[in-house]
Amino acid sequence: MTLASGIEVSPEGVAAICGRYRIRELAVFGSAARGDMRPGSDVDILVEFEPGTHPGLGFFRLEEELSELFGRRVDLGRKSLLKPLVRPSVLRDAVVLYAA
């Protein structure tokens, strides 16, 4: 699949990573979702884990794997931890790439 920003990402790769890390939903937001990325921009990704999943240090491994998959540095955030002030704009921009 191709994001609005022109980044190519493998749906199978996304699904495999999400399965390994017990991710319920993965979405891209920010400039990658809107299509206004700059050359040095990172990819903002929001995840929601399956109930009872506590990734611990696996969160950082997940960020590294996603960076490899997207071919850019990934800034990973948890949907459940979004601050109320930014939540509406983040969710408005979000493009879901995986949902279980």
Regions found by a protein language model. Give the residues of each.
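Catalytic core of pol beta-like nucleotidyltransferases
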Residues: 1-25, 34-39, 50-100
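Conserved histidines in hydrophobic membrane contexts and catalytic metal-binding motifs
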Residues: 28
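N-terminal beta1-alpha1 ligand-phosphate binding loop
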Residues: 31
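Short hydrophobic/aromatic beta-strand micro-patches
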Residues: 46-48
